[in-house]
Amino acid sequence: ATIRFVDNQKDFETKLKSIGPDLLNDKNMTYQVFKKVMDKHKEKNIVKVLMDQKYISGIANYLKSEILYHSGISPHNIIKNIPESKMKELYQSARLKIVSSYNKGGASLRHYADIEDKKGQFEFTFEVYNKKVDKNGYKVIAEDTLDKRRTYWVKEKQVLYE
């Protein structure tokens, strides 16, 4: 994540306009809007679009892996090859995982203390992120994907559409 401070309204509004719709807070981020974003970038790899905050905001790296796993989509898919039914499932998984993570205080591999030294323990449960095997005993693959980030996925569960 990047934090950028601005000292005037114009710079703030310019930055805000460069960020895509937010899956957590934007009530206008319906499936139709999500699909329109995906269709606009249909020649691109799914992980590149999910992780590019100018297209869709709010998907952290751990969420990318969890969303793709939950929807059964390989991180190696080109968007145009993903069937409509799976695209709907991807949208639903994204909303579910983001809201779940938010409601549980986010996710962390470690405990931490906030600025008031209050200890926190994030409760979001990982299914594949930073795991060796999934709940079914399948090996979790950890690899750097086209978004230049580490992605955790399960070949037996996540389909590559061609």
Indicate where each model-derived feature is located.
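Structured catalytic/nucleic-acid-binding cores of DNA maintenance enzymes
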Residues: 1-162
